[in-house]
Design a protein with these regions (language model features):
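Bacterial N-terminal signal peptides that target proteins for export
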Residues: 1-10
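Bacterial N-terminal signal peptides
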Residues: 9-20
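Extracellular, repeat-based ectodomains that mediate carbohydrate processing or recognition
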Residues: 25-286
């Protein structure tokens, strides 16, 4: 790796996502820490969601968006119209679409499109966090899902290094503006949320970090991350990893998971470095 320690520290400061809740531009966050969530689709193609939260029965109707637009500085990303407190109902035809991460409920609509409820903890403290609000996400799509690909290799021969891409229909998923902590400020930006298993943080799953996809170079929607000791915290290298991202627009949440790559392999390292360099991202110069 050609990173210097100073540049890695600066890069980490740029990429760390803010822990405060940021605007939800992807699959709509319907509620937090909910129980008993149900989903049905009416004859008008609207989704009816009911759930219990804060000791109360709640409901919301969603319509007006499907799939996602390609990144643009001129047109906002698609988003649902939501009306809370409106009760109604419909049917949930059997789901026959692709497997989904963090799935609670999925339905096929009469027009052949799909709706899904997914529940996961998006925001946790970096470098070892385990707790946060369980968010309920609603999505609507037809066709292929977003794709989250991730590759492992080594930095300095010993630290774990990740790089990858978030794509939709073959194009990178990325935004144009963000806070200094990496929280998207437009409707296109996306963060990658990485968890590590049985690391020095402790047994089970712990949050390692979260960071933006990039819009530099000729391979857009890419990202990279090194499992170095950060700000007094140990390296988060674990026995396995998972990475989760909200899809663009109102597409579903997607996840990647794999075991740790293991001991250093010079041949694999050369292959992975060549791949990362071919993407041309100045932030990810392997």
């Amino acid at each position: 790796m050609e990173y210097s320690r100073r540049s890695l520290t600066i890069l980490t400061l740029i990429l760390v996502a803010a822990l405060a809740p940021a605007p939800a531009f992807g699959s709509a966050i319907i509620g937090r820490n909910v129980t008993g969530a149900t989903l049905s689709i009416d004859r008008q193609g609207r989704a009816h969601v009911s759930y219990r939260s804060g000791g109360r029965e709640r409901s919301v109707v969603a319509w007006g968006a499907i799939n996602a637009r390609a990144p643009s500085t001129h047109t906002a990303q698609v988003k649902f119209r939501l009306r809370y407190g409106l009760r109604g109902g419909g049917v949930c035809l059997p789901y026959d679409g692709p497997p989904l991460a963090w799935l609670l409920k999925a339905c096929k609509a009469q027009d052949g499109s799909y709706w899904a409820l997914q529940s996961w903890v998006r925001l946790k403290p970096n470098y070892g966090g385990t707790r946060g609000a369980m968010e309920l996400h609603l999505s609507h799509w037809r066709g292929a899902l977003p794709a989250l690909s991730l590759y492992q290799n080594w930095a300095y021969g010993k630290y774990r290094h990740f790089f990858g891409r978030l794509t939709y229909r073959g194009r990178g998923v990325y935004g144009f503006t963000a806070t200094g902590h990496g929280a998207p400020l437009d409707s296109y930006g996306r963060n990658i949320y990485v968890d590590t298993f049985n690391s020095r943080y402790g047994k089970g799953w712990h949050r390692e970090n979260s960071f933006l996809t990039h819009h530099r170079g000729h391979t857009l929607g890419d990202f990279c991350y090194g499992f170095f000791p950060h700000f007094g915290h140990p390296s988060g290298q674990g026995t396995k990893y998972r990475a989760t991202a909200e899809g663009p627009g109102v597409t579903p949440v997607v996840m990647w998971a794999a075991d740790d790559i293991g001991a250093y392999d010079a041949t694999v390292q050369q292959q992975m470095q060549s791949l990362e360099r071919s993407w041309g991202d100045p932030k990810c110069r392997a």
